[in-house]
């Protein structure tokens, strides 16, 4: 373990500082497709009983009208975060009728591209902007890729911790700039080590054969309806034969916040010739993308982790980051575990806390020449063949066996987990870490291996397995209907969200073309 990490852990172990570690904040976003009783994509509108997808704080849609997204608030205790996520699931199932929530990350058998419904958000300008943005995604990348679901894990260190660390570092920057620099350091370490998360939690080694729509690929056929790779952990996070040339040069190496925001600003303000050839509007004059830039908006940039700041009404993410710095990070590379009703559990959450705190406290120099590329290569190697016996990764220009490096990382993360346990007065982070050690010792315990074992043992296709898990989880949630109080709270939130959407639609005065022009201009102000 580095001297710096040892020093920082000793600092935080002191009596005045140790309780601060209880104040890390967590939030979870879980996406899932609505499907019918046959395991096919639901072609119905977003259920009105769930409220407005535009304005509801907890239940919205992602790309497709059928791709639900559940959003928890933030809490210091991940048990509360998961309890809130479960309550959202139970309410949703109380209103879903004969539809279901698809269990894994990779989608059910999909209809033709043209028939995948894009999410609708009503007639307000902001609602139309969200819809046109999604039309642009369809135009640029196709609809099929947008139907993949995942878990997003939001995490922040306690605000009171930053002055302690800054004073210890002897750093003279403003607290805002110091905090942002340290979060960027966390992100650099995440880039170095996130392959470990793919090995431990990747759960998409197989997919429905129709997903690739006849594109060339390097996958193997498990049966007539299933494609897979024998040692894959997360095909969701691989390229799957899809290339994104526009974003190819966009991977920032996260030297500092200003270089990150500058890179993103260039992407949302620089035209890209192939998109210019498509045009903003189609031949009939209908909007088909917001603009012809490399990115229509900041969130189009596809990354495994994002620096984040809560935005004010009408404020864009870049403006918020520039004005007030980084507030938290969003981990975006986590597969949904199809063996878990929520797709994530407490053990995973507690390990993520220890892992992310390790990334924040460990030494994190800027990624040197070649290190940025090596981090990307390691990640892609693990998602495609992470369970291959003897697999080697690149570390500091040298080959190292995955198992050896994973063991060394877990030894260091164990010290962070022990500190978290001292702060909480229990041993739950150490127990979560022990579960991950077992997976490194025996790859058959990983979710990806367990998925393939189920397919082979039961002679099931991917979609048959997925529907079996979907039905089991539906039974779980429907057997625990919301209490009368919960039902009333969710129904009130749904009704209020519909009222907010109606009010927005009634008060819009600007025409949509002018609204989009103002939105584009807002970044240069």
Curated annotation (Swiss-Prot):
Keyword Membrane tagged: no
Family: Belongs to the glutamate--cysteine ligase type 1 family. Type 1 subfamily.
Keyword terms of this UniProt record: ATP-binding, Glutathione biosynthesis, Ligase, Nucleotide-binding
InterPro entries per record: Gln_synth/guanido_kin_cat_dom, Glu_cys_ligase, Glut_cys_ligase
HAMAP family referenced in this protein's UniProt entry, alphabetically: Glu_cys_ligase
Protein name in UniProt: Glutamate--cysteine ligase
One cellular component (GO) term of this entry: cytosol
Gene name tied to this protein: gshA
Record's catalysed reaction(s): L-cysteine + L-glutamate + ATP = gamma-L-glutamyl-L-cysteine + ADP + phosphate + H(+)
BP terms from Gene Ontology: glutathione biosynthetic process
GO MF entry, a single one: glutamate-cysteine ligase activity
EC number(s) from the headed UniProt entry: 6.3.2.2
């Amino acid at each position: 373990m580095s001297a710096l990490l040892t020093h920082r852990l000793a600092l935080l172990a002191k009596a005045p500082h140790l309780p601060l570690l209880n104040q890390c904040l967590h939030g979870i976003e879980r996406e899932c497709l609505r499907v019918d009783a046959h395991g096919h994509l639901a072609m119905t509108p977003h259920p009105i009983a769930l409220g407005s997808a535009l304005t509801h704080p907890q239940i919205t849609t992602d790309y497709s009208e059928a791709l639900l997204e559940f959003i928890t608030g933030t809490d210091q205790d991940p048990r509360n975060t998961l309890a809130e996520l479960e309550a959202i699931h139970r309410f949703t199932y109380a209103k879903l009728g004969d539809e279901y929530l698809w269990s894994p990350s990779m989608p059910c058998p999909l209809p033709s591209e043209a028939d995948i419904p894009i999410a609708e958000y009503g007639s307000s300008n902001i609602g139309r902007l969200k819809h046109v943005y999604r039309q642009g995604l369809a135009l640029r990348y196709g609809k099929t890729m947008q139907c993949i679901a995942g878990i997003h894990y939001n995490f922040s260190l306690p605000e009171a911790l930053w002055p302690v660390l800054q004073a210890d570092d002897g750093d003279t920057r403003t607290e805002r700039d110091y905090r942002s620099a340290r979060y960027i350091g966390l992100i650099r370490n995440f880039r170095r080590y996130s392959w470990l998360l793919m090995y431990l939690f990747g759960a998409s080694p197989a997919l429905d054969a129709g997903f690739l729509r006849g594109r060339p690929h390097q996958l193997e056929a498990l049966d007539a309806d299933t494609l897979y790779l024998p040692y894959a952990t997360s095909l969701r996070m691989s390229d799957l034969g899809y290339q994104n040339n526009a974003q190819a040069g966009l991977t920032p190496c996260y030297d500092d916040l200003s270089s990150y925001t500058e890179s993103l600003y260039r992407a949302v303000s620089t035209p890209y010739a192939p998109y210019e050839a498509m045009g903003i509007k189609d031949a009939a004059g209908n909007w088909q993308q917001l603009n012809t830039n490399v990115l229509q908006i900041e969130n189009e940039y596809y990354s495994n982790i994002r620096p984040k700041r809560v935005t004010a009404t009408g404020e864009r993410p870049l403006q918020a980051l520039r004005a007030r710095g980084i507030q938290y990070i969003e981990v975006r590379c986590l597969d949904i575990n199809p063996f878990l009703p929520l797709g994530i559990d407490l053990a995973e959450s507690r390990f993520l806390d220890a892992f992310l705190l390790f990334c924040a406290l460990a030494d994190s120099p800027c990624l040197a020449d070649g290190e940025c590329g090596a981090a990307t290569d390691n990640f892609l190697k693990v998602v495609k063949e992470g369970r291959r016996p003897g697999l080697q990764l690149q570390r500091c220009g040298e080959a190292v066996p995955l198992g050896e490096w994973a063991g060394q990382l877990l030894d260091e993360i164990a010290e962070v987990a022990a500190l978290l346990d001292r702060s909480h007065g229990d041993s739950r982070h150490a127990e979560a870490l022990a579960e991950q050690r077992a997976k490194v010792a025996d790859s058959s315990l990983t979710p990806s291996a367990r998925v393939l074992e189920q397919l082979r043992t039961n002679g099931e296709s991917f979609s048959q397995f997925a529907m079996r898990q979907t039905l089991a989880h539906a039974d779980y949630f429907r057997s625990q209907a919301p209490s009368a109080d919960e039902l009333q709270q969710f129904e009130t939130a749904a009704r209020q969200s519909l009222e907010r959407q109606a009010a927005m639609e009634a008060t819009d005065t600007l025409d949509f073309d002018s609204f989009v022009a103002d939105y584009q201009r807002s970044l240069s102000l």
